[in-house]
Amino acid sequence: MKKIIICFIFVFSINVSFADATSELIDKIKNIHSMTANFNQKLIDGQTNNNLNSKGNMSLKKPQYFKWITTSPNHQEIVYNGTKLWIYDGDLDQLIIKKVSNDIAQFPYLILLSKNTNNINKLFTVTAQDNNSYILKPKNDQMIDSIKIKFTPNNQLEYLEISTSLNQFTKIEFNNVKTDVDISNTSFDFKAPQNTDIIDETKSA
């Protein structure tokens, strides 16, 4: 009987720990009402041993606006306004317009938006670490192995790390971070340059 009680207490304490970590993470993300930053991104492909470094800038505004612009080595933009998702490749002069997507497997940084933040406890098991960081393990997603979110001591976003089932590892480091800045909603509407090849998937059946 004593063993059963001890096991119950152990399991209960683990569940409480996960719940506390999830609540802490949700509170930190919810406190980011708007944000701009520069980023440096490193992609390591374990299958090919190739590394790809890129950099750019991003902005977000709760509850639904997001912009991710890669400036080097190629020009790419991902813009999300809660209704449409624009994916622009400047080198290919191609724009893909998608229906609203909350696909965290494809776009892990969308976890910073309100709708996805509220669903963290449904999508992930969250573990807190000592250095103001959190490990998120998907409950169902087959593509992502884990996401690590690290905050600075004053709770600004410091970096994201994403490990996938394809043996790929991505680290996104943020700098020049500014939070609670005034950003116009219209800055999240994308207008394609002239002569862009546009693939509009929102018009498909």
UniProtKB/Swiss-Prot annotation:
Pfam families: LolA
GO biological-process terms attached to the record: lipoprotein localization to outer membrane; lipoprotein transport
Cellular component terms (Gene Ontology): outer membrane-bounded periplasmic space
InterPro entries in the cross-refs: LolA/LolB/LppX, OM_lipoprot_carrier_LolA-like, OM_lipoprot_carrier_LolA_Pbac
Leader peptide range in chain numbering: 1-19
Keywords on record: Chaperone, Periplasm, Protein transport, Signal, Transport
SUPFAM superfamilies per record: Prokaryotic lipoproteins and lipoprotein localization factors (SSF89392)
Family membership noted in the UniProt record: Belongs to the LolA family.
Subunit structure and binding partners: Monomer.
Protein name in the entry: Outer-membrane lipoprotein carrier protein
